[in-house]
A protein has these predicted regions:
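Leu/Val/Ala/Ile-rich N-terminal alpha-helices, chiefly Sec-type signal peptides and the beginnings
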Residues: 1-39
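Conserved alpha-helical segments that form or flank metal/cofactor-binding pockets of metalloenzymes
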Residues: 1-6, 56-93, 158-168
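Carboxylate-rich helix-loop segments that flank metal/cofactor sites and access channels
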Residues: 4-15, 79-118, 177-179
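A cross-kingdom feature marking solvent-exposed beta-strand/loop segments within repeated
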Residues: 13-24, 30, 57-61, 106, ...
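Acidic/histidine-rich alpha-helical segments that form the ligand environment
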Residues: 28-51, 100-148
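Alpha-helical transition-metal enzyme core signature, strongest for iron centers
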Residues: 32-46, 62-81, 121-124, 150-161
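Preference for long, well-ordered alpha-helical segments
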Residues: 123-179
Length: 179
């Protein structure tokens, strides 16, 4: 190890001790990068599903998932990645207008409310699994806390979706298995 490398190491250690904050490791940075890119795609899909939905409660849940969960996660992830000197994904998707009134979509092309609910439930479960994996790879308290908070919020949202699906009969009736 050269004198210059040793000096750099000592300087880095000194500042990390003062600031008590390490830079993101590769797993954390790549996790945030993936969360941002996938989140942007999910916003686009949620906008499309919102326009297919007929049920007002379902539309409200989709809007909540988009604004309170997905966009919040994207913004917080971008902030953390930028603070650590990481590059933000350049991928973008077209924005869609959210129509409160039902659109005239041919019945053969329109998703039913049950299909929309199942689709957003699948997106939610995949997102929660990805956040859980990213949480387990996090060493930074701030990053782990962000994932934990949003994962808890997502699970609460998922429960409300499940209740709506049960109330409207969008889930199949499963009979008890008796031996």
């Amino acid at each position: 190890m050269s004198i210059f490398e040793r000096f750099n190491e000592e300087t880095r250690e000194f500042f990390q001790n003062i600031m008590d904050k390490e830079p993101l490791n590769y797993l954390e940075a790549s996790g945030l990068y993936g969360v941002i890119a996938q989140g942007r795609y999910n916003v686009s899909v949620l906008e499309t599903l919102y326009n297919h939905a007929q049920n007002a409660e379902l539309k409200h849940l989709i809007k909540q998932a988009q604004d309170s969960l997905t966009k919040s996660l994207i913004n917080r992830s971008e902030d953390l990645l930028q603070e650590s000197g990481g590059k933000i994904p350049s991928v973008t998707f077209p924005r869609r207008t959210l129509h409160k009134a039902p659109l005239e979509i041919h019945p053969d092309a329109r998703l039913t409310d049950a299909e929309v609910a199942i689709a957003i439930g699948s997106i939610a479960k995949a997102s929660q699994l990805a956040m859980l994996a990213a949480l387990h790879q996090s060493y930074q308290v701030e990053v782990a806390l962000m994932y934990r908070t949003l994962l808890n919020d997502g699970l609460d949202w998922d429960y409300r979706l499940l209740q709506l699906m049960l109330k409207n009969g969008w889930l199949p009736k499963l009979h008890k298995v008796v031996n």
